[in-house]
Curated annotation (Swiss-Prot):
Family the entry assigns: Belongs to the MG032/MG096/MG288 family.
UniProt-listed InterPro entries: DUF237, DUF240
Pfam families: DUF237, DUF240
Upper taxonomic lineage: Bacteria, Bacillati, Mycoplasmatota, Mycoplasmoidales, Mycoplasmoidaceae
Originating organism: Mycoplasma pneumoniae (strain ATCC 29342 / M129 / Subtype 1) (Mycoplasmoides pneumoniae)
Protein name (database record): Uncharacterized protein MPN_049
Length: 632
């Protein structure tokens, strides 16, 4: 388990530590060491061990004076540096050809404030998104991810884009972090250093570059808890050996000033709870390097306006829509709760009214001992329970105070009703039967081939490829009560039986049918059956046992087509819907035919789903049938 946990974390955190907005990517190459503009960024490239800027001694071959570079090394007031840049070009054209080394340094100093403002905005927007989600919360993976959405609105050359796409993380890797949202992000530190290195070709030639470094600390929260990530984003200009080369590295088209930057992320620390995953993340990220043509106008110079526009787009196209969705969901929830409360209140009043109508509880209890008592009790109170509508009303009234006794009467009525219906070894075709069960007769259990539960496919195969007949054997149909402690798990405070309630009631009996019959395949199918070792015909006795009870298990109620756990009065159709748990067992003496039944899973079949899902019957119809028979 520990190995699988670490393997998962290696995949997850090494690929998703980009802050959801700052996710450290599994990087794809955009440059190589063979590229003439290649710049090698190192973890310690910009700072020496004592924390001072590492500026090398300059000789007479430099295009820049030592005094100028020394001054740059000390100018760490980034806000003042960038203010100086703006003053320098306040009244003259912003032309890269007029840039000095100090101008470039001061321009890049503006990154500190622009990135800090961007990070601040991300935090503010994430707070607003979280507040909108608090209206009526959804799962964390459904909450808009601010970094992903926000940087989708910025210009192509905006830098840095602190989201998975902006940091070149693959979609399949970034998706691993969808369950996490940014909790807090901070730009902890920023630095710029002018670096010098010897040319790898010309021995006496030196090259320079500006190295930028952003240090971030971020926290994410999601289904897996909190993640803390501290990382750096290192960037560098192209190498230059003179001021002219530095100026040439910039480009201006219209009002847009751009420059080429090479960059990479570096993991400093990654923790998940008490687990330190720093080394895993560093190994996964590696030393991949990217290059981008950065729009310095939107990234620094006009950053405030660019971010404002982006913020407005986010608030209009993401935040406002999400907030409206949550408000609508809350309103719908409240309306539904009000509807349910109203419905429950109406039911409560109705039950209270029914309770008050019971003048003699003992008489009511005694009326539930048998069919004759039940009929007599309600006749005295002006109800004709031979009428199905009045029967349902009587059952509801009695059930309001004596649900277990009513349930016992109903299940006894089901047992006796089945026995009475098949007492002549065939379905009852009387007027009473049709009145109680309808023109099609008793829905459960049926006899003959239609009474055997099987898949629709198998039933079709048997019908189309052969002849099958089953007839009830004389005086061999039995209904046997197995359980005496009969009760129903009725919870009045929850409206009775819940939608997916397991083990909702306790009763059990079995129905045994003994058939005489057989089957034979069509001659063509019989040939193929013989080749396949399948009996082409059978003749003899078949025992079919149905065990009916209320043991509705969890693996039944979780099936997609589970009808629901019913014990529900239906006033519109005058029925009492009732969900059964049924197990079917079939046995024959013929060994080869019995083996065929076993192969088809018909020897022991638990009705759960599809064409063999739990039956839903009108439980009151069996009692109605007995009442009609008693009165006839």
């Amino acid at each position: 388990m520990r190995f699988r946990y670490k393997a998962f974390l290696l995949t997850l955190f090494a690929s998703t530590t980009t802050l959801t907005g700052f996710i450290i990517p599994t990087l794809s190459q955009h440059g190589s060491s063979t590229d003439p503009s290649f710049v090698a960024l190192r973890n310690n490239s910009s700072l020496s061990c004592d924390g001072k800027s590492r500026l090398l001694e300059f000789g007479n071959d430099l295009g820049f004076s030592k005094e100028e570079t020394d001054v740059l090394a000390k100018q760490k007031n980034w806000e003042q540096n960038y203010t100086n840049f703006k003053k320098q070009f306040e009244h003259k054209l912003l032309d890269p050809k007029s840039f000095s080394l100090t101008d470039v340094y001061n321009l890049f100093s503006g990154f500190q404030q622009s990135v800090a403002d961007t990070v601040k905005l991300m935090n503010e927007l994430q707070t607003q998104v979280n507040k909108a989600n608090d209206i009526y919360p959804v799962e964390s993976f459904q909450v808009p991810k601010v970094p992903q959405k926000l940087f989708g609105f910025v210009d192509q050359g905006f830098f840095p884009k602190l989201n998975p796409k902006g940091l070149n993380i693959a979609d399949n890797v970034a998706s691993l972090f969808e369950k996490y949202s940014l909790k807090q992000a901070t730009l902890k530190d920023f630095d710029i250093v002018l670096e010098k290195k010897n040319d790898i070709v010309l021995e006496h030639k030196v090259r320079y570059n500006f190295a930028l470094q952003f240090h971030f600390e971020t926290t994410y929260i999601g289904s897996g808890g909190e993640i803390n990530l501290q990382f750096a984003l290192q960037a560098s200009t192209t190498n230059f050996s003179s001021l002219e080369e530095l100026q040439a590295s910039f480009s201006k088209v219209g009002n847009n000033l751009t420059a080429q930057l090479f960059w990479k992320p570096v993991v400093n620390k990654l923790t998940s709870g008490e687990n330190d995953l720093t080394h895993i993340a560093q190994t996964a990220v590696g030393e991949s390097l990217f290059d981008s043509r950065v729009d310095l106008t939107s990234s620094i110079i006009n950053n405030e306006a660019a971010i404002k526009t982006t913020q407005q787009q986010f608030e209009t196209e993401v935040l406002a829509l999400f907030k409206a969705e949550r408000e609508k969901a809350l309103a719908e929830y409240k309306a539904e709760q009000e509807r349910i409360a109203k419905e429950l209140e109406e039911q409560r009043k109705e039950l209270e009214r029914l309770k008050k109508e019971q003048q003699n509880k003992q008489e009511l209890v005694e009326s539930l001992y048998n069919v004759a008592n039940f009929v007599s009790y309600w006749e005295k109170r002006g109800k004709d329970v031979t009428d199905k509508k009045q029967l349902i009303q009587a059952l509801k009234s009695a059930f309001a105070t004596n649900w277990n006794e009513v349930f016992q009467l109903l299940t006894a009525g089901m047992r006796e009703g089945i026995k009475e219906y098949y007492k002549h070894n065939k379905p009852d075709q009387s007027a009473n039967a049709k009145k109680a069960f309808g023109q099609n007769g008793l829905a459960f259990p049926r006899t003959g081939f239609d009474g055997i539960y099987m898949s629709d496919w198998l039933r079709g195969e048997l019908r189309n490829k052969g002849n099958i007949n089953l007839h009830l054997k004389q005086n061999e149909t039995t209904v046997k009560k197995i359980r005496d402690d009969i009760s129903i798990e009725w919870n009045e405070s929850k409206g009775g039986i819940e939608f997916h309630q397991t083990y909702p009631y306790w009763f059990e009996f079995e129905v045994n049918f003994k058939y005489i019959g057989g089957y034979s395949l069509n001659w063509w199918d019989a040939i193929w059956a013989k080749v396949a070792g399948i009996p082409g015909s059978w003749k003899g006795e078949m025992n079919l046992k149905l065990v009916i009870d209320g043991e509705i298990h969890k693996w039944m109620v979780t099936k997609p087509d589970y009808p629901r756990t019913f014990f529900q009065f239906d006033d519109q159709f005058d029925k009492l819907w009732f969900t059964l748990h049924v197990s079917q067992e079939i046995s024959v003496r013929d060994e080869s035919f019995m083996n065929l039944l076993k192969k088809q899973g018909l020897d022991k079949l638990d009705l759960r789903t599809g064409s063999t899902k739990p039956p839903v019957v009108d439980l009151a119809s069996y009692l109605h049938y007995l009442i009609l028979a008693d009165k006839s």
